[in-house]
């Protein structure tokens, strides 16, 4: 992922200026990487090493979403809606 794209995502989902580690930012960055890797795997169906990486990223995102549910359900609902994810 390019630095400019990453910076744009961080600015969009940051809770305050300079925020790079909040769950919302991490989830948004993972979602972007997951979507990019999904497109790659549509073309390269036998790339099982990348598929494993994709599954690990999906699991990590799921963990962050579960954390967000426990901490603040409204923030969870907002990020789900903003990123157009399933519940």
From Swiss-Prot:
Output the InterPro entries linked to this UniProt entry: Ribosomal_uS15, Ribosomal_uS15_bac-type, uS15_NS1_RNA-bd_sf
Q: Which GO terms describe its molecular function?
A: rRNA binding; structural constituent of ribosome
Matching entries from SMART domains are given as:
Ribosomal_S15
Q: Does the keyword RNA-binding apply?
A: yes
Q: Please list the GO biological process terms of this entry.
A: translation
> Which is a Gene Ontology cellular component entry for this protein?
cytosolic small ribosomal subunit
Q: How does it assemble?
A: Part of the 30S ribosomal subunit. Forms a bridge to the 50S subunit in the 70S ribosome, contacting the 23S rRNA.
Write down the HAMAP family for this protein, in alphabetical order: Ribosomal_uS15_B (MF_01343_B)
Protein name per the record? Small ribosomal subunit protein uS15
């Amino acid at each position: 992922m390019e630095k400019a794209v990453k910076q744009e995502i961080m600015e969009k989902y940051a809770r305050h200026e300079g925020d790079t580690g909040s769950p919302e930012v991490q989830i948004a960055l993972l979602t972007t990487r997951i979507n990019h890797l999904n497109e790659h795997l549509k073309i390269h169906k036998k790339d099982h090493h990348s598929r494993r990486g994709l599954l690990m990223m999906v699991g990590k995102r799921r963990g962050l979403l579960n954390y967000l549910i426990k901490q603040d359900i409204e923030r969870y609902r907002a990020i789900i809606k903003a990123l157009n994810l399933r519940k």
